[in-house]
Amino acid sequence: MAPMGIRLSPLGVAVFCLLGLGVLYHLYSGFLAGRFSLFGLGGEPAGGAAGPPAAADGGTVDLREMLAVSVLAAVRGGDEVRRVRESNVLHEKSKGKTREGADDKMTSGDVLSNRKMFYLLKTAFPSVQINTEEHVDAADQEVILWDHKIPEDILKEVTAPKEVPAESVTVWIDPLDATQEYTEDLRKYVTTMVCVAVNGKPVLGVIHKPFSEYTAWAMVDGGSNVKARSSYNEKTPRIVVSRSHSGMVKQVALQTFGNQTTIIPAGGAGYKVLALLDVPDKSQEKADLYIHVTYIKKWDICAGNAILKALGGHMTTLSGEEISYTGSDGIEGGLLASIRMNHQALVRKLPDLEKMGH
């Protein structure tokens, strides 16, 4: 006889037991999932270009904290880049051919920098999507902890936290920009870069020069440690372009701006953006415009785009379109970057340079 005179049928007992087992299973499976996540057993990415997409329930992240970690990541990656170059053991190999037919080179500097940068950011912000140039090998996974200290120069410029949904954030990492020049020991062109985009728009960028140990950073509507120069020459500009197609751009530039125009061949997109700014680095050349006419990857340009945008400058395709940092990892329409100039007037003035890159 059941208590209180209630009689339980065999069917009722079975239903009650099944409900109890269901509750226990739900609780236990949730506990196990949490433990697997804690110890990194939940499937770290093995893909070359991207980490896992952000979870829909990832909460929020603080852009000020992301800036601090991005600066640290760029510096840590730069330490690896410098160490490998100074050892003179690069383990250089080709990943294939670029669209222009050149070797797409990779070195130990690329790989080791990528590992430090990716896992520092991924450990600090596990719920955001991270896109990186090099393959992320799960066998080389590291847990690299951030001490949650924000540098004073960032606190001075960005005085309050800036929370955004984690699912809106995409991080773009270039662990070694100007690999070709790196293999040639042309050190001044080499940078490491981190960019954070929110809903596809670049909002913070970091460009670090490992061999001079100079770091530029900026946050849109936040602050920066770098500034524009006091003046630019719009009539006969100095134009910084890739070493591989300087002749192609020079011909058009002379026709457009006249014989006094100067073409500066250079390696690395990060270096070229810094050429437009007031950078206290004696090895850094100065330019008024940055033009690129061929296909380029977003991790090459996102950080520079964010810095220019934060300082009131512009980076667009050659036809004047804004660049979205979601979806595919490259853009076809070439680049025009400027600051303190009439950017759209420059777009209209230039001929269809993008067609020359094909």
Swiss-Prot record:
It comes from the Eukaryota. Its cofactor is Mg(2+). Its EC number is 3.1.3.7. Contains N-linked glycan resistant to endoglycosydase H. Glycans are attached at residue 259. The keyword Acetylation applies. Belongs to the inositol monophosphatase superfamily. The active site is at residues 110, 179. One of its GO terms (cellular component) is cytosol. Strongly inhibited by lithium. The chain crosses the membrane at residues 13-33. This is Golgi-resident adenosine 3',5'-bisphosphate 3'-phosphatase. Exhibits 3'-nucleotidase activity toward adenosine 3',5'-bisphosphate (PAP), namely hydrolyzes adenosine 3',5'-bisphosphate into adenosine 5'-monophosphate (AMP) and a phosphate. May play a role in the formation of skeletal elements derived through endochondral ossification, possibly by clearing adenosine 3',5'-bisphosphate produced by Golgi sulfotransferases during glycosaminoglycan sulfation. Has no activity toward 3'-phosphoadenosine 5'-phosphosulfate (PAPS) or inositol phosphate (IP) substrates including I(1)P, I(1,4)P2, I(1,3,4)P3, I(1,4,5)P3 and I(1,3,4,5)P4. Residues 85-106 are annotated as: Disordered.
